[in-house]
């Protein structure tokens, strides 16, 4: 319910802007993926600002993104994330990141010298092309303005997922 990072607005709602008669369900699905990627870009920018672009370990900026979980099995998701963030995206062999982590902990607990790369190696990388990054950069300027407006709209009583009709005026 609502918008999570980087917005943190519990009552926020989503919407599709700019739809035309030529758009179909596939366009809506891609727009949803692009929206999630845009929030990932916003979170990445906030993390870089807070860290002074030193990275989480203080040794310098992060070099690309790593996808884990079931979403990492979809090449389109990696392509969109790479294009929207402008970062290379790497995936691991198994989408079961939690299981690989549990196996790593178990192996470590009994003294086996195993690393995450042994259990679940990197297998694929998606490097964004300059053309795609530029297209998403232009798209992002509009998307950011729309998102900043949408998260602050007040849809009134019932827009919290309760009995009312969300978004009715």
What is the predicted function of each stretch?
Residues 1-169:
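Glycine/Thr-rich phosphate-binding loops that ligate phosphate moieties of nucleotide
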């Amino acid at each position: 319910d609502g918008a999570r990072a980087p917005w943190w607005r519990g009552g926020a709602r989503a919407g599709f802007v700019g739809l035309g008669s030529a758009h179909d369900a596939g366009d809506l699905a891609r727009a949803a993926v692009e929206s999630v990627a845009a929030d990932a870009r916003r979170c990445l920018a906030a993390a870089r600002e807070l860290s002074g672009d030193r990275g989480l370990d203080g040794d310098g900026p992060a070099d690309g993104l790593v996808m884990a979980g079931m979403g990492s099995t979809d090449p389109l998701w990696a392509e969109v994330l790479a294009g929207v963030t402008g970062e290379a995206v790497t995936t691991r062999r198994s989408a079961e990141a939690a299981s690989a982590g549990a196996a790593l902990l178990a192996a470590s607990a009994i003294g086996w010298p195993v690393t995450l790369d042994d259990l679940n190696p990197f297998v694929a990388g998606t490097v964004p092309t300059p053309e795609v990054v530029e297209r998403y950069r232009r798209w992002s300027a509009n998307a950011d303005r729309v998102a900043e407006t949408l998260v602050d709209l007040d849809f009134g009583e019932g827009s919290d997922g309760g009995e009312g009709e969300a978004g009715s005026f």
